[in-house]
Amino acid sequence: LFDNLYTGTETRDPVTTDQHLPRYLSYSLMTYFENMWPGHNGGGWFDNFDTHVTEHYLEQAYLTAFSKPKELMLFCFQSLYDNVYVPALGFQLDKLDALLDHAGKPVGIACYLPDNCQGEDNIQDFLGMVGLPVVCTPYFPKEAPAILLTRSSACVPDVVQKLERYVAARGRALVTRGFVEATMDRGI
């Protein structure tokens, strides 16, 4: 249907806006789409709407950049023209460029989020913001050294069998309470 995609990584202020999106989503959504369709994610875009302090705007840029996109796009020129965020971002982008020249591909705990699944709203992103390096994927990460399974992972009927094979092969798994509750009747 489409040749490529571009990812909106705006998270705004998670406390005062209606979206309540954790900031780590700026990173995890990029890695999710890159893992879904490698090489076809053109980049990440973010805006300055509902970012009441400069740090909120800059954090969207940092987290998007750390996902190693092909490019960053600053959305909505009219809202950025003559705005205090732009000089601050320019200053930080120079530093990010120097840092990212030495960074490799994003790695971390593989969080299995199958397509079209509902679960614990963004729990992986909250875990990311407290320091767990979470990288999201729509495919069961059987080769990953460590995985995170949430209620969203439980929407796949054979996920418990996949988990059993993974752990039997010496993989390390972290599961959430939501995953356990959703799979109790499947032998977890």
Protein language model features and the residues they cover:
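Hydrophobic targeting/anchoring helices
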Residues: 1-133
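Helical hinge/lid and interdomain linker segments adjacent to catalytic or ligand-binding clefts
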Residues: 114-186
